[in-house]
């Protein structure tokens, strides 16, 4: 698992290889990842936007931005957690992802919460990027 803490908001990521959706002979490698966001702060926040930097084994970078996560913009009161799962396909057997969430307080203050860098490694492959 990979962890990051920003302003008492913790992001934990657990990536996993999706062998049944991958086809190495066709250069298709797919990972899922489970993310748990815990609001350990004293204020409520809403996850407004996301930013991902996805880098494959060859250094090809794909930047992804958009509103919320998996179609939601969850509000986390102090002590709340929010969990979701998503996925990422690559053309190479290894990669790296990191990013941030843009959060907004009830007072309208915006700030970024780090998503830790995490490896996407095919089973049996030595770690290349992390």
Curated annotation (Swiss-Prot):
One GO biological process term is:
error-free translesion synthesis
Q: Which stretches make up the ApaG domain?
A: 3-127
Do you know which SUPFAM superfamilies this protein is assigned to?
ApaG-like
Q: Which InterPro entries match?
A: ApaG_domain, ApaG_sf, Uncharacterised_ApaG
- Tell me which Gene3D superfamilies the record gives: ApaG domain
Q: What is this protein called?
A: Protein ApaG
Gene name, per UniProt, is apaG
